[in-house]
């Protein structure tokens, strides 16, 4: 039963180092750091999903950082249910076991999941804007 972390390196996200530190202190044996220029394909995320085994724990920075919308969320939750994977989202303050963030309510979770498509789209838009600016500056 491994503890594994995943974070997408978004250019505009200031909490990246804090999240990595949290994952390390929690005891993650591996922390996957996906580059934002690979956001569309996310090969490391896909590889991580293939490697997770029954009873593992997955620590993510935030659901909108790891998932891109409601359809992916539904697949992800079913995948974790079937494989009995504990999911911990640091900034959403969600622990599927209910141990780490007992103050998080059902309403909080519903609001987080309801806002997921909008937050994921904003993340992609900001990353695309930064990439566009890098291209313009380099030409």
Predicted regions and their residues:
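Short amphipathic alpha-helix with an adjacent loop that forms part of the alpha/beta core around
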Residues: 47-51
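Phosphate/pyrophosphate-binding and catalytic-coupling "lid/hinge/switch" segments at subdomain interfaces
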Residues: 80-139
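Short, solvent-exposed amphipathic alpha-helices that sit
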Residues: 14-24
